[in-house]
Amino acid sequence: MIGRGLLAVALGLLALAPIKARAAEKFTTIYSARVMAQALPWIAEDAGLFKKYNLDHSLVFIASSSIVTAALLGGDPDMTMTGGVGNVIAFVRGSTDIAYVGSAKNLMTQNIIAGGNLKRPEDLKGKRIAVSRIGSNSHYFTIQALRRHNMEPNRDYTFLQSGGDPESLTALLAGGVEVACLTPPTDVQALSRGYHYVIYGPDLKIPYAATSFVTKRSTIARRPQAMAQYMRAMGEASKIMHSDREVVYKVLGKQLRIDDRSILDAAYNAEIKVMEPRLALKAEAFQAILDEVAQTDDRAKKVKPQELTDPRFLNDMEKSGFWDQIWGKR
């Protein structure tokens, strides 16, 4: 009887053992852009946060938000970090398993950059503008920004799909295009080469779920604990991003091969102003995308922003005191 009693106690203690004592759970994130706004997984890896939260994490880069959405629906990743209208279009068309669980950025910070005598938006008529992909953040921003100057795609300008921000910069520097839509820190690299802003995006304050954490409701149901641990890792990475620029510079320097501190300073100072410290989901950011999709698909008019999101992990991080613990009450 004593032996059985000791065994029962031992099993009970094992059940109460901290999560770190258990085997790490495999977890895959796909991200779509090599930019500061999508640097949280890089920061988490550098800081050992995935290990802290008992995740055996794999990070995969695919330079297309539409392909990332297809991969998500195909069942490959546990989480995606992406922007663009792809996820919303898929939801509107019936893929309602998609769920946004957090956002790193809810405003657009792209910029339209050119050289020579191209100074005003009107000067871009007839030009080809480099964007990463059709349907990407840079594509959407260019349309929205130039629409404010009564300019429309195909009628007044066309696009070159480069594949990503670094590739758009390469096309600009090589003379393949005269205009490019770029995001920090790539825009600052162009400025250092003598190019200039035609439109400075942050001034426009265009609401948009530009960088979000997107998964599937079925994955949440199957792996709620792993999802909760992942979001806490991202929460801590966000704290590092906002409070320790030296770590951010180290990570960006490694990932983007940038060692010019003036470029990193300019990029960080511009981007950090619009990053969400607590990964907030904002209705207006999703409504902006729904409004755009509704121009070609009436079904988007019936979708409410709240239907796209699942804030359970953010709510738990708030109620449990997680945010207050890492930020300090303020």
Features from the language model and the residues they span:
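A bilobed periplasmic-binding-protein/Venus flytrap-type ligand-binding module shared by bacterial periplasmic
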Residues: I43-A44, T109-K119, A209-Q225, V274-P277
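N-terminal secretory signal peptides that target proteins for export/translocation
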Residues: M1-I2
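Pocket-lining segment of extracytoplasmic ligand-binding domains
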Residues: P166-R257
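Conserved C-terminal helix/tail region of periplasmic/extracytoplasmic solute-binding proteins
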Residues: D291-R330
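Bacterial N-terminal signal peptides
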Residues: G5-A17
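Secondary-structure end/capping motifs
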Residues: A221-V303
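Signal peptide processing junction and immediate N-terminal pro/mature segment
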Residues: P18-R22
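Short, glycine-/small- and polar/acidic-enriched structural segments
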Residues: A23-A174, E178-P184, H196-P207
